[in-house]
Amino acid sequence: MNRYRTAEAFWQALEGRLRDLDPAKPLAQKRQLLAFERFLERVRQVRPGTILKGGLGLRLRDARARATRDVDILLTGDAEPDGAILITAGRLDLDEYFSFTVQFRRALIGTKGNQFHSKCTIGGKLFAEFDIDAAAPAPMVGEVSAIPGCDWLSFIGISRPTFDVYPLAAQIAEKLHALTVPRQTPNTRDKDLPDLAILARLSDGTPTAIIRAALEATFLHRATHAVPARVGGVPAEWAKPYGRLAGELGLEWRTFEDLQLAVRRFLDPVLSGEATGSWSVAEWRWR
């Protein structure tokens, strides 16, 4: 039970705790992550089986992954999520003073779903705000993982939540699809390449067949272009922002060239059909 009698007293205690936890990270970033998790816990209670994907799912798997500004979920049971579940979830009282409003923003492009905007408040005071991409389930290869969230509210007796996170193989396939989809304008998705390298680092022991099946299912479902034979070239303009990102996150691929090579060694053998066996992170090759 929340021992703080007012929302203001809780806010002050929470801010102090967040500042003490991992002082190197910006307070706003920690606020955002906590708001994400408290909202997702509400959605999970209203709609069990909701699957978390996207950047937040990757961040829960690996704390070194980049921060994200939105929540990306699959709402099981909804042919095309209309927001009713999210609005109901936002109103749940979980005895921690958080409250969420949810408003429709736009329909998602390329998938059945909608984007919503949420404001998280504590005692009527804005704590964080973010977008929610809520989509209906699509063909999915691989196993959903149960990943624990943050233990930041234990001081008021709230246990660490656990979330169902999108399969690694399916996320790899979607990242590659987004990276290679034909475009009429310059590709600005410069975060997809480092995300793929991090996903490779998390995929130790994954069989080639699982990655290949996920690629085939994703590209068939999206129906925009064929599975490529190789990763191919990426815009040279991505090198500068990657240099900053690598420094911020302490990524082991120090240069943009190192990053490209790492991703190609992971995916090109699968795309060409040469890879067999399973992925070895230690050797960074298929064996």
Residue ranges and their predicted role:
Residues M1-R287:
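Compositionally biased terminal segments of proteins
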